[in-house]
């Protein structure tokens, strides 16, 4: 049946939208943090990225101003992999980090011989290198030590452009809440899940977004979500997905 709550569209919005103090980005989005990120195109450049990030961990050695820090984001793939769904997923994920509103700027570190080539990723993601997105390749920089040194230098060059960014009042519609089913114990079912559900409902009423991963976990409660669907079409997609799992 296709009638699992589809007629009750969830449209209750608040009159006065909540706000928070965030970092407004050039693309109009807002973040809750102000980091410089060090990304990797491949697992082989993970150590270099970690060393670059660690160079800024010692408090007081570098004037970061309003930057929250320099953090490395590494993963375990990108090297000898098939150019299929796995590579596409990796590139989408990298693009999401590169454009994340919590990152003022990013440095992307590659090895040089990996399947996930940085130029190909940039082109596919519609990104361009510039002041907010810089890249480097270990095999072109003279090895690990020289790449770390150059990477630290590049981040230091980036810091002055972003350490003076000020927090400003922005609407709660900029917020996205990410949810994942953790331990399936009594506490999650009795306290955590209902509490987070209420928080997600409240955020959505203020124009924000909530994302729940692990889709099968909503089995048996899909009618509660279809009632909140923005349209019947969206509600039907939820029902179709659950029926696919059946």
PLM feature spans:
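Single conserved hydrophobic/aromatic residue that forms the stacking wall/gate
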Residues: 1-6, 10
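Buried, small/hydrophobic-residue-enriched core segments of structured protein domains
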Residues: 11-244
């Amino acid at each position: 049946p296709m009638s699992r709550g589809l007629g009750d569209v969830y449209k209750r919005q608040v009159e006065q939208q909540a706000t928070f103090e965030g970092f407004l980005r050039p693309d109009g989005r807002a973040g809750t943090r102000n980091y410089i990120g060090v990304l990797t195109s491949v697992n082989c450049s993970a150590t270099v990225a970690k060393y670059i990030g660690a160079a800024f961990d010692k408090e007081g050695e570098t004037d970061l101003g309003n930057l929250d820090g320099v953090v490395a984001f590494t993963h375990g793939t990108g090297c000898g992999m098939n150019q299929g769904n796995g590579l596409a997923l990796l590139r989408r994920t990298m693009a999401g980090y590169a454009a994340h509103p919590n990152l003022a700027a990013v440095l992307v570190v590659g090895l040089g011989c990996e399947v996930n080539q940085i130029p190909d990723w940039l082109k596919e993601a519609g990104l361009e290198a510039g002041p907010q997105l810089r890249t480097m390749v270990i095999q072109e920089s003279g090895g690990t030590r020289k790449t770390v040194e150059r990477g630290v230098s590049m981040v230091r060059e980036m810091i002055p452009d972003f350490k003076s960014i000020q927090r400003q009042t922005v609407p709660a519609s900029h917020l996205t809440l990410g949810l994942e089913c953790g331990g399936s114990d009594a506490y999650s079912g009795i306290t955590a899940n209902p509490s987070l559900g209420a928080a997600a409902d409240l955020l959505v009423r203020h124009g924000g977004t909530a994302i729940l991963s692990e889709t099968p976990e909503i089995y048996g409660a899909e009618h509660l979500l279809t009632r909140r669907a923005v349209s019947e079409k969206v509600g039907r997609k939820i029902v179709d997905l659950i029926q696919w799992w059946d």
